[in-house]
Design a protein with these regions (language model features):
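Residue(s) in the substrate-gating loop at a strand-loop-helix junction
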Residues: 167
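Short, small/polar-rich loop/turn modules that mediate ligand/substrate recognition or access, typified
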Residues: 199, 204, 259-261
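Substrate-binding pocket helix/loop in short-chain dehydrogenase/reductase
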Residues: 94, 122-124, 128-136, 218, ...
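Short C-terminal tail/terminal secondary-structure segment
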Residues: 121, 172, 232, 249, ...
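Alpha-helical segment proximal to the catalytic Tyr-Lys
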Residues: 152, 196-197, 257
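Short-chain dehydrogenase/reductase
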Residues: 1-105, 119-122, 130-131
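Active-site helix of classical SDR
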Residues: 147, 183, 191
């Protein structure tokens, strides 16, 4: 197994891409810690969901939160796993959780920065200032916070893999997605800069650039808009979470040891503008 003996942290791992990533890393041999702002057993989950927007409210109220279930499934594979509550915008909490992972598991080798928010599509004049600020805090600063917290542990071991979740919205733009597109473009810039810094410590830093992926969030979207986006892909269909997860396992492995600073499109060719 290509990731045997490695310890991975997946942020935003309770559903969708994060859940698929966690399971795929475990199948490849890694021990996996899942973090999310929503946990099934959290008695304050409804309050947390309300704080972080309509998508989280819907997922929490509909029972579409699987962080602890996913950890159980991973342990049933014979791997070590736990689910921890984490708000990536809280720097002190991020440092505490990453330190706990290292203490409990002995190392912290792989970081998957998947935690993000996208729950509003509005044109510029209707963009709420507080949602702009929130998206920056979660999607971009949250990624920075997690990278900074794990960096010393990876440097100490002389090995590390950081994989950041970007988006075609960050490379192509998105109508009515000024805040989301800006944060994901920022993630790509952060990825390249950290790749340069990490190389001297044998830490690779790459980004996945998903296109239209069949997740809970996608299925919540406007059906006509979803159809238009699907028809722009070369395959004329959405990808599956496992398509992202398989790319992540590759980038986390030594098969990708000479790859860094790369935005890897897993997008079905949506950026090709096929006709």
């Amino acid at each position: 197994m290509m990731l045997q003996g490695k310890v991975a942290v997946v942020t935003g791992g309770s559903r969708g891409l994060g859940r698929a990533d966690a399971l795929a890393l475990a199948r490849a041999g890694a021990d996996v810690v899942i973090t999310d702002i929503l946990l099934e057993s959290d008695s304050n989950a409804a309050v947390t969901a309300e704080k972080y927007g309509s998508l989280n409210q819907f997922l929490q109220s509909s029972g579409a939160v699987y962080a602890e279930q996913t950890a159980t499934e991973i342990r049933e594979m014979g791997r070590r796993s736990m689910a921890l509550k984490l708000d990536v915008t809280d720097r002190a909490e991020v440092r505490r959780v990453m330190a706990l992972v290292r203490e409990e598991f002995g190392s912290l080798d792989i970081l998957i920065n998947n935690a993000a928010t996208l729950d509003h599509v509005v044109q510029l004049e209707n963009q709420q200032d507080e949602l702009w600020e929130r998206d920056l805090r979660v999607n971009l600063t949250g990624t920075f916070n997690c990278c900074k917290a794990v960096w010393p542990y990876m440097k100490e071991r002389g090995w590390g893999r950081v994989i950041n979740m970007a988006s075609v919205a960050g490379t192509l733009g998105g109508f009515g997605q000024a805040s989301y597109s800006t944060t994901k473009a920022g993630v790509l810039g952060l990825t390249r800069s950290l790749a340069l810094e990490g190389a001297r410590h044998n830490i690779t830093v790459n980004a996945i650039v998903p296109g239209i992926i069949n997740t809970e969030a996608f299925r919540m979207g406007n059906a006509k808009m979803n159809e238009r986006m699907i028809n722009r892909t070369a395959f004329r269909r959405p990808g599956e979470p496992e398509d992202i997860a398989n790319a992540i396992v590759f980038l986390a492995s030594d098969n990708a040891k000479y790859i860094t600073g790369v935005p890897l499109n897993v997008s079905g060719g949506i950026e090709l503008f096929t006709f």
